[in-house]
């Protein structure tokens, strides 16, 4: 079957080569996850989940990096609640998916980008990848998705 690419998104590229769906983060140069990207990722995950011909979801970043995390501009008092709700929706859709999810990590994988990768079923990471949670140095709460999964649960549960 030929590769099918969805053109309805601007912050992610969604393509299908059944049984695999590819979701590529598209916000160069660092693939910072802004609210618009969160909304598109959630919409893409709902679309993917509805397709019986897709068994695997592969997340990757375009260019040189997976993702440098969530947009710092979304961490303000007037935006953080909405941002967290949208990001948690993405995490929930991914964790509750019946599809196998894989993060293909290269370059920077920081903050929310690392959270996104870590909630996938498998993480394939380049030896040169840089992982971290720099939001802690800004006084932001440590990664919610990672603490919510609490190490033991997800990988033993599947």
Task: Outline where the language-model segments fall.
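Hydrophobic/aromatic residues within transmembrane alpha-helices
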Residues: 23, 59, 71, 116-118
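Conserved CoA-thioester-binding segment of acyl-CoA-metabolizing enzymes
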Residues: 1-62
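Short, small-residue-rich loop/turn micro-motifs
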Residues: 18, 61-63, 70, 127, ...
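Short strand-loop junctions, especially beta-strand C-caps/beta-turns
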Residues: 26-28, 78, 108, 136
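Glycine- (often His-adjacent) and acidic-residue-rich active-site loop
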Residues: 38-39, 53, 61-93, 109
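Nucleotide phosphate-binding site architecture
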Residues: 31, 73-76, 132
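Crotonase-fold acyl-CoA enzyme core
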Residues: 6, 95-158
């Amino acid at each position: 079957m030929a590769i099918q690419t969805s053109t309805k998104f601007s912050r992610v590229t969604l393509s299908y080569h059944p049984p695999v769906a590819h979701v590529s983060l598209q916000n160069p140069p660092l693939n910072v996850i802004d609210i618009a990207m969160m909304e598109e990722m959630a919409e893409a995950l709902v679309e993917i989940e509805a397709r019986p011909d897709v068994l695997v979801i592969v997340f990757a970043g375009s260019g040189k990096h997976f993702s440098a995390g969530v947009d710092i501009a979304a961490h303000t008092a007037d935006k953080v609640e909405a941002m967290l709700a949208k990001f948690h929706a993405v995490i929930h859709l991914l964790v509750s998916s019946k599809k196998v999810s894989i993060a293909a990590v290269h370059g920077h994988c920081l903050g929310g980008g690392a959270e996104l990768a870590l909630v996938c079923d498998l993480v394939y990471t380049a030896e040169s990848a840089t992982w971290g949670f720099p939001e802690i140095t800004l006084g932001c709460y440590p990664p919610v998705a990672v603490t919510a999964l609490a190490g033991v649960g997800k990988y033993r549960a599947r």
